Amino acid sequence: MRNAFRIPKRTTAFLAVVVVSVLGLYGIPARGQMAGVTLYISGDTNIQEMFDKDLLPLFERETSVKTKMVFLEHGQGAESILAKIIAAKRTGQQTDVDLYETQPTFIAQGSSEGIWTRITKDNMANAAKVNPNRPEVLVSNGFGIPYRGSSVVLAYNSKYVKTPPRTYDEILAWIKQNPGKFTYCDPQTCGSGAAFLYVALYKYGKAEDFSGLTYDQARESAWEPALQLLRSLKSNIYNNGFYPNGNVAVLQLLGRENIYMAPVWSDQGMSYLDQGLLPKDIKLVQVSPPFTGGDSAIAIPVHAEHQASGLMFLNWLLTSKAQTIVVNKLAGYPGIDWKYMPKDVRDKFAGIAQNFSPLPNAKYQADAKRLWQEKVAGSGQ
């Protein structure tokens, strides 16, 4: 999601998973013997390890299905894969891409070509466990099903902050009352700083006006009060207006107690805490309205060669057992609703287990970051 998914390094990668045989469908009607399924997954390099060492071995044990995984570095060819799926549909051919994980906006683009299978509880039982109002589900027009996610949350040092802010306005007030003890990273270098910027913009313009596929630069006039607000905070930011480069730099400032509060990625914060790279006094909490976040969504082409196998695999991936692996390995959010997760997992994520605000689309993101640089970072005090 972002400068993304998280010391978990944020690069994009692809996996191709070939399922050699299928013996059963988890809540999906049998369609005879299924020869295989090819799955492309975009994500970080740690996603490869999760599939290779955890998910696929468990899947094989539970289904007697043999799998093969091919890892393609850095997510090369995401758009060409979409073009390949569209081309096959236009020529009336099947595609060997049975499952495709990509940005929800790509899925939305493909939906206009009629290339995706609409996934519901009628053709995949565990689809009922996914919140239909999740931002990425809405952006992908219901054709994309999330199986993992993450959001930006508020990190604070409980040794110095006894009662953390629970709203964005309370954060703004805290910053002014505690000069020098808060910062956020340059939005051009990290997703957590961008989230702090986007929620400020959403104070003066509706999130839904900027998160869809349409783009109207004239709407950006609504952002001016937000940019003025962020500029007014500059003298209260750490080191008189220092915005570090990257998510890691913010976590390091928190770890050294140079600052007491900052927005961070939920999975990065949890990962640092688990590794002892942040003091135990650092706590994570989501605020209202929530910071932005994102899901990794999977779609199944309507003309996939092994569509039934694809539905089976995705349905298995949305079981509570598989989702627990995803959450624990990535310190992120499950694709299914939290209420379907084991109690110990819910307890671990109690402070941040909420929905997140949608991201602006790519054009608005680029404009917002440019305007922040011009009118906030580049301005005087």
What is the predicted function of each stretch?
Residues 65, 90-99, 115-116, 178-181, ...:
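Alpha-to-beta junction loops
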Residues 150, 227-233, 277-302:
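Periplasmic-binding protein-like
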Residues 33-105:
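Early extracytoplasmic/lumenal segment of secretory-pathway proteins
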Residues 291-360:
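Mature extracytoplasmic/periplasmic domains
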Residues 354-381:
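Conserved C-terminal helix/tail region of periplasmic/extracytoplasmic solute-binding proteins
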Residues 107-109, 261-280:
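A ligand-binding cleft/hinge motif common to bilobed small-molecule-binding domains
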Residues 55, 65, 167, 225, ...:
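Short amphipathic alpha-helical coupling segments at ligand-binding clamshell hinges
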Residues 42, 46-52, 76-79, 97, ...:
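Extracytoplasmic ligand-binding site segments that recognize negatively charged/polar headgroups
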